[in-house]
From Swiss-Prot:
Coiled-coil parts of chain: none
Region (Disordered) location: 665-707
Cellular localisation: Endoplasmic reticulum membrane
Protein name: Lipase maturation factor 2
A GO BP entry: protein maturation
Biased composition (Polar residues): 679-691
The organism's place on the tree of life at top rank: Eukaryota
GO CC list: endoplasmic reticulum membrane; membrane
Protein purpose: Involved in the maturation of specific proteins in the endoplasmic reticulum. May be required for maturation and transport of active lipoprotein lipase (LPL) through the secretory pathway.
InterPro entries per record: LMF
The organism's taxonomic lineage, starting at the top: Eukaryota, Metazoa, Chordata, Craniata, Vertebrata
Glycosylated residues in this chain: N489, N616
Amino acid sequence: MAGSRLPRQLFLQGVAAVFMFAFASLYTQIPGLYGPEGILPARRTLRPQGKGRWQQLWETPTLLWEAPRLGLDTAQGLELLSLLGALVALGALLLSPLRHPVIYLLLWAAYLSACQVGQVFLYFQWDSLLLETGFLAVLVAPLRPASHRKEAPQGRQAGALPHEDLPFWLVRWLLFRLMFASGVVKLTSRCPAWWGLTALTYHYETQCLPTPAAWFAHHLPVWLHKLSVVATFLIEIAVPPLFFAPIRRLRLAAFYSQVLLQVLIIITGNYNFFNLMTLVLTTALLDDQHLAAEPGHGSRKKTATSWPKALLATLSLLLELAVYGLLAYGTVHYFGLEVDWQQRTIHSRTTFTFHQFSQWLKTLTLPTVWLGVASLVWELLSALWRWTQVRGWLRKLSAVVQLSLVGTATVALFLISLVPYSYVEPGTHGRLWTGAHRLFGAVEHLQLANSYGLFRRMTGLGGRPEVVLEGSYDGHHWTEIEFMYKPGNLSRPPPVVVPHQPRLDWQMWFAALGPHTHSPWFTSLVLRLLQGKEPVIRLVQSQVARYPFHKQPPTYVRAQRYKYWFSQPGEQGQWWRRQWVEEFFPSVSLGDPTLETLLRQFGLQEKSPPRTRSANSTLAQALHWTRSQLSPLEAPALLWGLLMAVGAVRFVQALLAPCSLRSSPLAPVSGEKRRPASQKDSGAASEQATAAPNPCSSSSRTTRRKK
């Protein structure tokens, strides 16, 4: 059976990369979002209630409780955490010795600390997904690099331990929960666009931050949009159970279908690090053999296959074809696919009702839980069998201790995850074991397991709602305040900002969906613009000179609600067209009774001036200097610069690595040393006979050390 050493390494590197992007993106926005002059100052969220130190840390788990001990306020502590998090994640991405459980525990704790004070700007599903994935990385990461281990059991990768595949199975289970729930909620929401298969005729122009490619995708034929929705349901609902298929090719087919979906989303929408995180999760569907990493895999000679193996291969192929046929039949049947040869189109429609789907979901949800149980039991039994192959009583004892600890943690996390997963079907939620509910309730605040369900309802069916802020000096002549990323200027093309998430622009999209009273932070934003606070202005325009009121703050600020649509192909120089709908926020000025009432109603009034006692501490000055050096860079440029730096370092590492390591798609980097083998491999006896094997020969990768 193919191992999972390289997929695990790929997963750990991917998690490190996403943490790096997430911390760096957040760092650029902290002063405007959480600083003393920000929209929602972080210092308001951490108020000691007279509780013990450990009690308040458990109830509100954030390292920022310790910021005053370092001479920092809460926002400065958040800056320090973000900087250190980005640097540590960068190190883990480049150096294999840093892919250690302690490192990933620190990254997880730092991001959890940020989420505790992040308020509405850190309430996104991908923030929860990163926390859950980051904690799984703590279990997946090896305690010791493979190069420092003794010989592995026969038939296993060098350095493999019996328990190593167990936590990696949880990654596959998380991917299943994410995708299956995201598909199911589109139908349980009763959204007419999803049920009518017309969701993508609206999605590209109504999503939060479209890319330029979204304009072109929006103008594709309607029948292709509807067929794409059918494909989405297929990939998100029907394919995920194949993640646990015993047939390897089915798992690989499921892998490529998920990759296709995520890549298309990345091309047409700016969803920060979410799609990258999902791609990282898909590594749990891979194996060493698929990554061309099995020792000697390419040099093995074909041998005659015994009839039992041939029969098993034939049965596997027949079962595989049966699964593909069943998926094809179900798609054609339940979505009424018909080919119109004259018009060269494919017609599609939903042929089942909401009641039928609800009954199907009620019937299927609990069996998917048992599918997970069966798959986990198989992994546990496989780990036990691998343990029996360990030689030496001391190694056996060490292996059984590790297997017991990791196995218990894996089962516990699986039980915890069943509670949020069962939210997709209330009946299943009520039938879960009460012990799972108690476990989940005990650790819910740590976000070890979360419920998911993206794009539940399609918004903007009658046009994309958009809030446009305006400022004025006299209350009669108004100037629009244009944001860097969200739609505003009709002639400006949509930007490409992935993997950065401009969190204010995202919340502006949510604010436009309802009245301003549903978004209390918006009143604080208006206040900061009236006050001319530069940290907030930099969230709107990083180059302050481009802000229309950079010389003097506006006397009045108001907001209008528009409906936006993509322009038609024939309109030259225009990406958008719009229509005024209504006033979103009334015209106010500093001291205006309306503004003061709203601030008091939402608890946003400044009760005391911000403390400045930490301004002179050495650490605070270092943070201030770092900010001054990085502030001229726009956030996407900073993140792309980090990505290019990683690519450059990897390129240099590849050049300096031995030839035998270059051929591997995940060649080990600094910190992993290879030792010459002294024991012959059965498939390369002649090459091993030499005293000093050529480091560039294929046999050098298949050698083993003596016990």
